[in-house]
């Protein structure tokens, strides 16, 4: 999402648990979505290949609807919650702006909070050696941007030369220096394991060793810069304001390429495969089906698909709105809550809603969406994206 299994050889709960690792730990797929290339790619990572075979056999047993069923997706998270809950009073799961990974025994976990700029490492192994904590810290800080499920031990020394992955340029050491090289990463990890380990007690009475690592103050901007080339390319291709694309990404995921929500939505622009993703596949890419999780966890593909959907909203679903600024506000609201709810906010029917929107100023349209849209989440979303858009306009 290890060995192949026959139908019925795993119970439903075990199969869900096996698939959960893939829901929470994505990998990058090859340029072409062919089974041959996927097989070649998977062969490089035996553990993932075994999980993939298990998952596919389970899907054969349940039927294809298991891939898109919200109840089954919720069950994936519930399976992890159950396993982790045996050890942790508070079970943490990945969210759009938070990446959480447990070790295989569920006794250690790492959390990257992309919104607030923090890395939190916890272990129930209170007798862990300093060296073990150092390695846990180093692995977390070196989470790669393309596949966080790959063991860092598989990577060459050259690729592990300092923090070159997801947190590149966002970690400063005890001296206030950017942690760029392997020797500095190692030294900082040792300092943290010696000076910043706290002992806490959970509600269930178990002790936890905890290390809090703050990210740099400009962590959001540093991550944003990583994805700027893809944003600019998608902007040119689909003729969408790059500042709006950046604002959407910032609001949806805080530039976390592995963002996942219970909807389920995936990746930087939080695309729902069975709605927006399917629409883009059919109308823009001229492909059947819908994007896979693998597709949407690829930052370039996610940005292009999300931008293509913004273009669809602008030029197809909301093209009857004459004022470009009014249309932009409606596009923002529709990206979150759908075009139908935008029309509902202005009276229900498409024709009457368009007439009412076109009779208002752009500021009045904004205020109406902020106060009269049927979904509170969308009302707040319009405000957040609007503010983010202003922040990114000078940068693109």
Q: Which role fits each region the language model picked out?
A:
Residues 302-352:
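Catalytic and binding regions of secreted/periplasmic enzymes and modules that target cell-wall glycans
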Residues 239-263, 271-272, 306-307, 331-336, ...:
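Short, functionally critical alpha-helical segments immediately adjacent to catalytic or ligand/cofactor-binding
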Residues 258-261, 281, 344-348:
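Short, solvent-exposed loop/turn and secondary-structure capping segments
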Residues 291-301:
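A short, structured beta-strand-centered segment in the mid-to-C-terminal lobe
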Residues 262-290, 304-312, 358-360, 385:
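Substrate-binding/active-site groove segments that recognize
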């Amino acid at each position: 999402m290890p060995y192949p299994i026959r139908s019925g050889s795993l119970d439903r709960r075990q199969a869900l648990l096996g698939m959960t690792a893939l829901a929470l730990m994505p990998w990058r797929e090859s340029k072409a979505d062919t089974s041959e290339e996927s097989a070649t790619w998977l062969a490089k990572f035996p553990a993932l290949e075994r999980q993939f075979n298990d998952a596919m056999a389970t899907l054969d047993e349940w039927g294809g609807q298991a891939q898109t069923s919200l109840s089954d997706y919720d069950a994936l998270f519930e399976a992890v919650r159950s396993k982790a809950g045996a050890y942790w009073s508070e079970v943490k799961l990945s969210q759009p702006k938070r990446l959480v990974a447990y070790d295989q025994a569920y006794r250690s976990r790492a959390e990257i909070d992309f919104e607030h700029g923090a890395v939190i490492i916890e272990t129930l192994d209170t007798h862990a050696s300093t060296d073990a904590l150092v390695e846990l810290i180093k692995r977390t800080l070196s989470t790669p941007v393309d596949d966080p499920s790959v063991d860092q031990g598989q990577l060459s020394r050259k690729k592990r030369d300092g923090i070159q992955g997801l947190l590149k340029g966002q970690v400063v050491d005890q001296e206030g220096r950017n942690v760029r090289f392997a020797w500095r990463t190692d030294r900082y990890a040792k300092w943290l394991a010696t000076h910043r380990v706290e002992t806490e007690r959970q509600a269930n009475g178990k002790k936890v060793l905890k290390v809090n690592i703050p990210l740099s103050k400009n962590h959001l901007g540093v991550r944003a810069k990583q994805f700027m080339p893809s944003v600019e390319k998608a902007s040119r291709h689909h003729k969408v304001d790059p500042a709006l694309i950046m604002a959407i990404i910032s609001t949806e995921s805080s530039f976390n390429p592995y963002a996942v929500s219970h909807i389920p939505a995936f990746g930087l622009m939080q695309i729902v495969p069975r709605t927006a993703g399917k629409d883009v596949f059919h109308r823009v890419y001229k492909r059947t089906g819908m994007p896979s999780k693998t597709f949407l966890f690829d930052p370039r593909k996610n940005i292009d698909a999300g931008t293509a959907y913004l273009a669809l909203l602008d030029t197809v679903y909301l093209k009857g709105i004459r004022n470009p600024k009014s249309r932009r506000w409606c596009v923002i609201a529709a990206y979150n809550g759908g075009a139908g709810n935008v029309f509902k906010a202005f009276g229900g029917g498409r024709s009457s809603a368009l007439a009412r929107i076109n009779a208002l100023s752009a500021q009045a349209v904004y205020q109406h969406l902020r106060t009269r849209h049927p979904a509170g989440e969308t009302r707040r979303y319009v405000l957040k994206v609007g503010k983010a858009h202003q922040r990114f306009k000078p940068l693109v």
